[in-house]
Amino acid sequence: MGVKGLLFSIVLINLSLLGLCGYPRKPVDVPFWKNYEPSWASHHIKYLSGGSTVDLVLDRSSGAGFQSKKSYLFGHFSMKLKLVGGDSAGVVTAFYLSSNNAEHDEIDFEFLGNRTGQPYILQTNVFTGGKGDREQRIYLWFDPTKGYHSYSVLWNTFQIVIFVDDVPIRAFKNSKDLGVKFPFNQPMKIYSSLWDADDWATRGGLEKTDWSNAPFTASYTSFHVDGCEAATPQEVQVCNTKGMRWWDQKAFQDLDALQYRRLRWVRQKYTIYNYCTDRKRYPTLPPECTKDRDI
C-alpha cells in the first residue's frame, strides 16, 4: 500500500470512529415497521401514510400497544405523539423502556388524561432493580393534543435524561456510589400503549372514563431509535464498553448550563409533584435525591 492509500485508510478509520462517538445523530423519521411491531390488540392499531404515522385506538373492548423488535442497552430513543383530545379523563398514554424480568429496570412517560379544559399531567418514573416509587409529575407548557411533540430518553452509564421537545424535564444520575442501583446490565425494549386506567389516572380515580366520547385515539410519528442492540451477554459486554458510542462522550455525561437552566424552569413553573420533596412520604430522602443540583 502506498502513502496515498495509507492516508486514505486512516481517513476512513477516523470517519468510522466519528460514527461511533462524539457526534449524535439527529432523530431520523422512519416508518413504524422499521423498529416496532404490535404487542397487543393489533386490530386497534391504524397505519397511515405507509406506516409513517400510527394511531392507537381505545374503546370499551380494548386499548392497544406496540413494542420495539429489539432490545437495547443505552442510547437515544424518541417518538412524536399527539395525545387524545377532548375529555380524556381516565385514559393513559404511555411511552416507556423496560427490561423483562422480576427485578426489572424501567423508564416511564405516562400521560394522564383529564376533563375537557383541564391540562394533561405527565408522570415520569424510573425503576432500577425492581424498585420504582420515583414519580415526578408536571404540566406541559403547551396543549399536547393540538399537534405532535417530541418525547425522548437519553440513557448512558452516567445518567438518564428525559426530554420534551429537547427540554430536559428530568435527570436521574448514576448514584451507584450511594448504594442506588442504576440500569447497567439489563437490555430494555421500547413500549407504548393506550389503555383505560380510570381507577387511578385522573384525580386518583375520582374522575371516570366517559365512554360516550370513545373511541379515543393517540397518534404517533417519527419512530427514532439510536441504541446499542443487546440480545446476548456478549452484546451486553460490548454495549458496556465505555467510549464506543457518542452518548459516552463528555458532552453527554452531564447536562450543560443551558439544559440546567431549562430543567430549573420546568421545576419552578410546571412541576406539581416530586418524590424528592415529599417529606411525608419520605421523611428521610432517598439517597439519589441528595446528590444532584438539578433535584
UniProtKB/Swiss-Prot annotation:
<keyword id="KW-0325">Glycoprotein</keyword>
<feature type="glycosylation site" description="N-linked (GlcNAc...) asparagine">
    <location>
        <position position="114"/>
    </location>
</feature>
<feature type="site" description="Important for catalytic activity">
    <location>
        <position position="108"/>
    </location>
</feature>
<dbReference type="GO" id="GO:0016762">
    <property type="term" value="F:xyloglucan:xyloglucosyl transferase activity"/>
</dbReference>
<dbReference type="GO" id="GO:0004553">
    <property type="term" value="F:hydrolase activity, hydrolyzing O-glycosyl compounds"/>
</dbReference>
<dbReference type="InterPro" id="IPR000757">
    <property type="entry name" value="GH16"/>
</dbReference>
<keyword id="KW-0052">Apoplast</keyword>
<dbReference type="InterPro" id="IPR044791">
    <property type="entry name" value="Beta-glucanase/XTH"/>
</dbReference>
<protein>
    <recommendedName>
        <fullName>Probable xyloglucan endotransglucosylase/hydrolase protein</fullName>
        <ecNumber>2.4.1.207</ecNumber>
    </recommendedName>
</protein>
<feature type="binding site">
    <location>
        <begin position="123"/>
        <end position="125"/>
    </location>
    <ligand>
        <name>xyloglucan</name>
    </ligand>
</feature>
<feature type="active site" description="Proton donor">
    <location>
        <position position="110"/>
    </location>
</feature>
<dbReference type="InterPro" id="IPR010713">
    <property type="entry name" value="XET_C"/>
</dbReference>
<dbReference type="GO" id="GO:0071555">
    <property type="term" value="P:cell wall organization"/>
</dbReference>
<dbReference type="InterPro" id="IPR016455">
    <property type="entry name" value="XTH"/>
</dbReference>
<feature type="domain" description="GH16">
    <location>
        <begin position="22"/>
        <end position="220"/>
    </location>
</feature>
<dbReference type="Pfam" id="PF00722">
    <property type="entry name" value="Glyco_hydro_16"/>
</dbReference>
<feature type="binding site">
    <location>
        <position position="281"/>
    </location>
    <ligand>
        <name>xyloglucan</name>
    </ligand>
</feature>
<comment type="function">
    <text>Catalyzes xyloglucan endohydrolysis (XEH) and/or endotransglycosylation (XET). Cleaves and religates xyloglucan polymers, an essential constituent of the primary cell wall, and thereby participates in cell wall construction of growing tissues.</text>
</comment>
<feature type="disulfide bond">
    <location>
        <begin position="276"/>
        <end position="289"/>
    </location>
</feature>
<comment type="similarity">
    <text>Belongs to the glycosyl hydrolase 16 family. XTH group 1 subfamily.</text>
</comment>
<feature type="binding site">
    <location>
        <begin position="199"/>
        <end position="200"/>
    </location>
    <ligand>
        <name>xyloglucan</name>
    </ligand>
</feature>
<dbReference type="InterPro" id="IPR008263">
    <property type="entry name" value="GH16_AS"/>
</dbReference>
<keyword id="KW-0326">Glycosidase</keyword>
<keyword id="KW-0961">Cell wall biogenesis/degradation</keyword>
<dbReference type="GO" id="GO:0048046">
    <property type="term" value="C:apoplast"/>
</dbReference>
<feature type="disulfide bond">
    <location>
        <begin position="228"/>
        <end position="239"/>
    </location>
</feature>
<dbReference type="GO" id="GO:0010411">
    <property type="term" value="P:xyloglucan metabolic process"/>
</dbReference>
<keyword id="KW-0134">Cell wall</keyword>
<feature type="binding site">
    <location>
        <position position="110"/>
    </location>
    <ligand>
        <name>xyloglucan</name>
    </ligand>
</feature>
<keyword id="KW-0378">Hydrolase</keyword>
<feature type="binding site">
    <location>
        <begin position="133"/>
        <end position="135"/>
    </location>
    <ligand>
        <name>xyloglucan</name>
    </ligand>
</feature>
<dbReference type="GO" id="GO:0042546">
    <property type="term" value="P:cell wall biogenesis"/>
</dbReference>
<dbReference type="Pfam" id="PF06955">
    <property type="entry name" value="XET_C"/>
</dbReference>
<keyword id="KW-1015">Disulfide bond</keyword>
<keyword id="KW-0964">Secreted</keyword>
<feature type="binding site">
    <location>
        <position position="204"/>
    </location>
    <ligand>
        <name>xyloglucan</name>
    </ligand>
</feature>
<dbReference type="GO" id="GO:0030247">
    <property type="term" value="F:polysaccharide binding"/>
</dbReference>
<dbReference type="InterPro" id="IPR013320">
    <property type="entry name" value="ConA-like_dom_sf"/>
</dbReference>
<feature type="signal peptide">
    <location>
        <begin position="1"/>
        <end position="21"/>
    </location>
</feature>
<keyword id="KW-0808">Transferase</keyword>
<keyword id="KW-0732">Signal</keyword>
<feature type="active site" description="Nucleophile">
    <location>
        <position position="106"/>
    </location>
</feature>
